[in-house]
């Protein structure tokens, strides 16, 4: 490990010497880039991630001097991947630069990939507001490139975090927008009932019984097969429980569905919010009597 660090430092010195020395403009930067690349690889082998990351940043700067945007972008991406192991902030900064350079070079799918990586880092940091911003950026790029599946995955993440932040209408709109065109795609249509279930749960969180009923009617029109699914039955039963302010009925409906198809943490969290809202209404009415 120490040997690799020493070798890395030697390559780094050679790179700096090339840049500051005499030589043809193009060739000296190419040689320096080669030395920085070797130095970064040595630091990676030594698991010295910060040094590897900073060396890749130097590599990108040198490459940009020779106007090779694709390679410069890739060097920033490599820096970001090294920094992922030590500093989310530095990783995000480098991946942002990579995405910018790929966009500038017309490599839109690559830019989308790195915006998505940034969003995932913010997700790990529990910074859902920023995660939404970067998943939206990635989704927009994928949509423009007609990469529908990738765009849907990013938009679903936006909806997930929007709902967690109680931005229910935004989440509903996204889930419905994903579900509608997916009905005409043989690969995507089987996921529609899941998107409609998620949208319906968000409707329940808003607590507007009329809106919930209207949404269920709309989902049946959108997908005539939906009314025959367990997801639809769950939403109908939950809507009735909300309307009747019946916590027991609500709990039983959730338990029945969960016994066949386990609810994930996101759905469980939102359904608990609805349940607590019903309980709060019951307490209000008890106080009034």
Curated annotation (Swiss-Prot):
The alphabetical list of record keywords is: ER-Golgi transport, Membrane, Protein transport, TPR repeat, Transport
Cellular component, GO, one term: membrane
Extract the CDD domains matched here: SNAP
GO BP annotations, alphabetical order: intracellular protein transport; vesicle-mediated transport
Report which superkingdom the organism of origin falls in: Eukaryota
The principal location of this protein is membrane
InterPro entries given for it?
A: NSF_attach, TPR-like_helical_dom_sf, TPR_rpt
Give its localization.
Membrane
What is the membrane topology noted in the UniProt record heading this document? Answer: Peripheral membrane protein
Q: Where are the TPR repeats?
A: 112-145
Family recorded in the similarity comment: Belongs to the SNAP family.
Briefly, what is this protein's role? Required for vesicular transport between the endoplasmic reticulum and the Golgi apparatus.
Protein name as catalogued = Alpha-soluble NSF attachment protein
Write down the species.
Answer: Vitis vinifera (Grape)
Source organism lineage?
Eukaryota, Viridiplantae, Streptophyta, Embryophyta, Tracheophyta
